[in-house]
Design a protein with these regions (language model features):
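Phosphate-centric recognition/catalysis
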Residues: 45
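A short, N-terminal "cap"/entry segment at the start of jelly-roll beta-barrel domains
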Residues: 1-34, 48, 117-125
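Structural motif
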Residues: 64-66, 73, 89, 99
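Short, conserved beta-strand element in jelly-roll/cupin
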Residues: 40-41, 51-67
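A short hydrophobic beta-strand segment most commonly corresponding to one strand
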Residues: 39, 83, 98-114
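Short beta-strand His + acidic residue motifs that chelate non-heme Fe in jelly-roll/DSBH
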Residues: 48-49, 67-68, 84, 90-96
Length: 125
C-alpha cells in the first residue's frame, strides 16, 4: 500500500476571499471531519474581512504576514499556527514584497457528524 498524495498545483489556483487557493476536498479517498485548502497571499494583498461559524486553523508555511482579528493585528510567519474561533472577524494582510503561503483547516459540528456517519458505513461490523 502506498500513500495517497494530492499535489499543490500553483498554476491551477482559484481566487477566494482575496487569496489564491487550492482546496483539498473533494478527495475520494479521504474521509475527514474537516475541510482544508492551500492559500497564497500575493505581495501587497489582503484577504476579505469575514467571519463564519466554523472553527479554523491557519498553518504558516512560507513567508510572513499579519492576521487581523476583531481589529487587532498580530505577526504571523512560517512555522506559526493560528486558531480562529467561530464568529471571529478576521483577515490576512501581506504588506510585504514576498508571497505568503499557509494551509487552512476548518470544521464544524455538521462536518464531524457526517464524518462519523461515513466512517460507520466504511468500517465492517
Amino acid at each position: 500500500m502506498s500513500a495517497e498524495i494530492v499535489h499543490l498545483e500553483p498554476g491551477n489556483l482559484q481566487h477566494e476571499y482575496g487569496l489564491d487557493t487550492q482546496r483539498l476536498q473533494p478527495w475520494a479517498v479521504l474521509n475527514a471531519p474537516f475541510e482544508s485548502s492551500w492559500a497564497l497571499a500575493r505581495p501587497r494583498t489582503r484577504s476579505v474581512l469575514h467571519s463564519h461559524h466554523e472553527h479554523e486553523i491557519f498553518i504558516a508555511i512560507r513567508g510572513s504576514a499579519v492576521i487581523e482579528c476583531d481589529g487587532k493585528r498580530a505577526s504571523f510567519r512560517a512555522g506559526d499556527i493560528a486558531f480562529l474561533r467561530p464568529g471571529l472577524e478576521h483577515r490576512l494582510l501581506n504588506d510585504g514584497d514576498e508571497e505568503f503561503m499557509f494551509y487552512s483547516v476548518w470544521w464544524d459540528e455538521e462536518m464531524a457528524e457526517k464524518f462519523i456517519a461515513r466512517n460507520r458505513e466504511e468500517v465492517p461490523a
